[in-house]
Amino acid sequence: MNSRRKFIKTGMLGMAAINLLPAINSFANQSAYNPGKPNAKFKLRFAIASDGHYAQPDTNSDLFYSDLIKWLNKDHHNNHLDMVIINGDLVHNRPDLLSKVKETYLDKLSVPYFTIPGNHDYADAAVWKGVFGYEDKYVVDKGDIGFVFANTADTKGGYVCPDYGFMNRSLDQFKNKKIVFVILHIAPHQWLIEEKAIFTDCPEIITLLHSYPNVKAAFHGHDHSLDGIRYTGKLPHLFDSHFGGNWGTEYKGYRIVEVTADNQIAT
């Protein structure tokens, strides 16, 4: 990925700006990504990946996971990562293998990691807590920065809107944060008519996200062919393609997000 598209979002004084670039094409071309400020000190630097689809038939999902862990640990060694997010579809219709994915691969990460279910994980709060120690919707507090994670699927793989009550309470809890990031496997908005079978239509969630000016971006997986950015109003929705599965972009990869001391956001 040699061409780097730039998207600039600026707002009121005191609001974070966001400089958005495509997701890292790390597996296809390790030289594709170059940090904007080498050796810079960041308030927070994290990686986000999705759609590993462990145990999908006719795929080498063990290789996909081992590659992801290798690349993330290398990135941490070279540039430092504060955390990693795996945004859904950790397994492919095999919730019984979530523990294996955790113990064999994710626990090998050199940094803390957080996960959220996707539609192929067939998981609810009880399943997720049994494996990862937290439920399928939760918040993470990183000082000036807050993360809101919510499940967007049921235990049969159906698509659902995020729990509105939880989202409302969580965003209100973080209303004094400088920056809030929202992590949802399935995007709660359909940009195109053809996406009725791909994303959910949750106008109340979109309105809620727009009502908090410190919500700076939403991150989604699910559509393996999307690596880039879409908007609802002025809110960026970022996609990171996939690191597993048998369809989507030709490359597999992940996204790096960097927040500077003055709350500039780059990815």
Model-identified regions with their sequence ranges:
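N-terminal secretory signal peptides and thylakoid transit peptides that target proteins
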Residues: M1-P22
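Metal-dependent catalytic neighborhoods of phosphoester/phosphodiester hydrolases
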Residues: N87-L106, A123-G133, I193-E194, D227-G233
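Active-site glycine-centered loops adjacent to acidic/histidine catalytic or metal-binding residues
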Residues: D51, G88-D89, G118, H185, ...
